[in-house]
């Protein structure tokens, strides 16, 4: 009989995402409701993502599943007592999985999912604009998987991750404070010229100077006078996903999995420069417009993920699960953006992320047999 289950949410996705950066864990609606647990659970075709070793515990000849989530996240920042908030669009992480039996103890499958991605929009004018105004990052992975149940209670599995993605990043290119200083220097230089002309006018036959330059008092505030848009597609990246599962008893199951690090590399992305106003264009355009005709290269990591967990069935219809996950963000030291033939404009952005632990606790109750 088809089972009807309800999730007992014990750890929310929001808490997990704080330490997961641009990692995506919303691989199925069921697991999202359960706080993203899954490494010690027998999830059928979806096990290819959470723990490839669990796939060979599938009790069907063939299974196909799919899920899509709609996420609208919000981030806030407080800078010197002023609050700032993102205006993000809806993101739609998804997965589609299919698996089939080869032998009673050998299963294979393939899954398509989005392990990493981010959509954030701080707007053009905020104190961190020179680092990030907006970013739309997408990573897709196709993973063929094989799982072998070595013993009745022990199974292992492995999958080859074939990944590609795209990035659309906008950031300030020139700090607003630098432009304010430049405008002030231009005014002071104009005043020196005007005063020199006044002195020269004291000599008979020398024409009087025109009107004195006027200091507008205008400042760019948090608005970078020039911003750069970077858009590109990554090359294929390869990684692996391995896992194991063991039934200690009929009630207790343990599992572990490891997804390797991948480097997403853009080798020939497109750059475009946008100016805050005509004064910025007139002042900076002759220097920065060359970027509109340059390609950029960059790379960023999809860090490794090590997960271990336990599942417990206190009664037949109730399953409780706990996962501990180590996210290898320590591999993200910096982001280097290099422009072909225009090395003077290369960007070196320090990241220095730290490894982070996340903990997931959830459960489900089967309402029917």
Language-model segments: which ranges?
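Short strand-turn segments of transmembrane beta-barrel domains in outer membranes
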Residues: 36-39, 63-76, 83
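N-terminal, post-signal-peptide region of Sec/Tat-exported proteins
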Residues: 45-71
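Outer-membrane beta-barrel porins/channels
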Residues: 20-33, 60, 77-85, 91-369
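Hydrophobic alpha-helical membrane context
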Residues: 14-15, 63, 155
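N-terminal targeting signals for Sec/Tat export/insertion, comprising classic cleavable signal peptides
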Residues: 31-48
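Enrichment for repetitive, rod-forming helical segments
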Residues: 9-10, 37, 266
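Gram-negative bacterial Sec-dependent N-terminal signal peptides
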Residues: 1-19
